């Protein structure tokens, strides 16, 4: 009998495959980070002003959250010890679920340890073989993977094209239809037309799953999210909408939740494998998030400051981008996409900013479509007016590189 004492032979292919990623500027690299003050970080030993964090309200380093985490650890310890349906559902986690449901004004909430696991779990719990799922072309990877895992028939409609979505819904013979969409699209920052999505789901008897990872805490009255901003809360919303949001962005901590009607949340509790078979999040995190919800609810000044920084950046870049092939998207949110195009040019822009002490990540395919590599500028209430002015000045310094790459008639 043949034996193979060494590593599997197919692993020999991996160095060449990694080299292929290098050749097309697609290999990802991690940075080692330590927080300093405000939006400033120590990145691989270098001080940087960061425009890459999803900590939109600047709460991740808030003393009230640190105090709540310490108090939670003293009360409950640091681990949950089991899955939620065995021994891991602490009093703190139960209280957080009640607080989350109240905050987003829906009947019931279910708390998960991670956003990615939430969507990859709840989608297969809702639809399966023989059912129809309708997905925006620019949805986040977790919704895409959840759709694939469900084995439902997937209908992918062009980004934001709700006429195309309606045609697909009208043509579908499936009894169970699920529409899934980001509320705020993570790489462009644009906001879905939630009212029209809801109306289409009512018209065609579909359920709407809305992923508000980048809107929760920032959009809507008192930061209650994109669904509340659209005026969809309470009983009417819960009959047709399943609302999902993450807690590691504007909330400043970690985890995620889904909220909806009593019966829908009970079904997900019974059928979501990523909830049933995963160790529950520790109670100290729930206590942290309860403190965060209070800060979000009282955080109108933070949101106003963030809105001012968004307006400052957008106004400041208008003259900078004139005559270049770089394009700033139309986002009104904290996610601002500066589309550059080629992978190598986006990487060069990122490195030029790093040399100036600014950390703005270059996002490349497959995260974004081919030919749309970009700088993803993430703004935060932790940024000052001077911080944003510094970024605008730095982009003005490096933008001529883009102009020089244009044909003469385009650069004129």
Curated annotation (Swiss-Prot):
Enzyme nomenclature, EC number: 2.3.1.47
NCBIfam families listed in its UniProt record: bioF
Physiological role: Catalyzes the decarboxylative condensation of pimeloyl-[acyl-carrier protein] and L-alanine to produce 8-amino-7-oxononanoate (AON), [acyl-carrier protein], and carbon dioxide.
Species of origin: Paracidovorax citrulli (strain AAC00-1)
Gene Ontology molecular function: 8-amino-7-oxononanoate synthase activity; pyridoxal phosphate binding
Gene3D superfamilies attached to this UniProt entry: Aspartate Aminotransferase, domain 1, Type I PLP-dependent aspartate aminotransferase-like (Major domain)
Pathway listed: Cofactor biosynthesis; biotin biosynthesis
One example of a Gene Ontology biological process annotation: biotin biosynthetic process
Residues annotated to bind substrate: 28, 140, 367
Family: Belongs to the class-II pyridoxal-phosphate-dependent aminotransferase family. BioF subfamily.
Cofactor: pyridoxal 5'-phosphate
Protein name according to UniProt: 8-amino-7-oxononanoate synthase
Binding site residues for pyridoxal 5'-phosphate: 115-116, 186, 214, 246
Quaternary data: Homodimer.
Modified residues (N6-(pyridoxal phosphate)lysine): 249
InterPro entries per UniProt: Aminotransferase_I/II_large, AON_synthase_class-II, AONS_Archaea/Proteobacteria, AONS_Proteobacteria, PyrdxlP-dep_Trfase, PyrdxlP-dep_Trfase_major, PyrdxlP-dep_Trfase_small
One Pfam assignment: Aminotran_1_2
Keywords from the UniProt entry: Biotin biosynthesis, Pyridoxal phosphate, Transferase
Catalytic activity: 6-carboxyhexanoyl-[ACP] + L-alanine + H(+) = (8S)-8-amino-7-oxononanoate + holo-[ACP] + CO2
């Amino acid at each position: 009998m043949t034996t193979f004492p060494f590593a599997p032979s197919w692993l020999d292919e991996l160095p060449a495959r990694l080299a292929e990623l290098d050749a097309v500027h697609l290999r990802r690299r991690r940075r080692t980070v330590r927080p300093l003050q405000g939006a400033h970080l120590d990145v691989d030993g270098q001080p940087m002003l960061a425009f890459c964090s999803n900590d939109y309200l600047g709460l991740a380093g808030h003393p009230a959250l640190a105090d709540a985490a310490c108090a939670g650890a003293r009360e409950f310890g640091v681990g949950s010890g089991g899955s939620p349906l065995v021994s891991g559902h602490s009093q703190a986690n139960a209280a957080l679920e009640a607080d989350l449901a109240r905050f987003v004004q829906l009947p019931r909430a279910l708390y998960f340890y991670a956003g990615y696991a939430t969507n990859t779990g709840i989608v297969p719990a809702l639809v399966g073989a023989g059912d129809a799922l309708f997905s925006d072309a620019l949805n986040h990877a977790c919704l895409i993977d959840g759709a694939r895992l469900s084995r439902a028939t997937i209908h992918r409609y062009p980004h934001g094209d709700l006429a195309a979505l309606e045609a697909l819904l009208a043509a579908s013979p499936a009894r169970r239809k699920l529409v899934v969409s980001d509320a705020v699209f993570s790489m462009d920052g644009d906001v879905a037309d939630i009212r029209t999505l809801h109306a289409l789901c009512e018209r065609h008897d579909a359920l709407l799953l809305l992923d508000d990872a980048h809107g929760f805490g920032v959009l809507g009255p008192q930061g209650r999210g994109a669904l509340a901003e659209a005026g969809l809360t309470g009983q009417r919303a819960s009959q047709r909408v399943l609302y999902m949001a993450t807690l590691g962005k504007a909330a400043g901590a970690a985890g995620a939740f889904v909220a909806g009607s009593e019966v829908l949340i009970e079904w997900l509790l019974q059928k979501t494998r990523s909830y049933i078979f995963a160790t529950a999040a520790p109670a100290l995190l729930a206590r942290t998030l309860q403190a965060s919800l209070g800060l979000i609810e009282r955080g109108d000044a933070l949101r106003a400051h963030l809105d001012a920084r968004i307006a400052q950046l957008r106004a400041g870049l208008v003259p900078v981008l004139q005559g270049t092939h770089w394009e700033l998207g139309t986002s009104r949110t904290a996610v601002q996409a500066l589309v550059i195009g080629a992978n190598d040019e986006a990487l060069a822009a990122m490195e030029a900013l790093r040399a100036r002490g600014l950390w703005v990540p270059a996002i490349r395919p497959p995260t974004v479509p081919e030919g749309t590599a970009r700088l993803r500028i993430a703004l935060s209430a932790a940024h000052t007016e001077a911080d944003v002015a510094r970024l605008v000045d730095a982009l003005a310094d490096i933008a001529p590189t883009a102009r020089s790459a244009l044909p003469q008639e385009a650069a004129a």
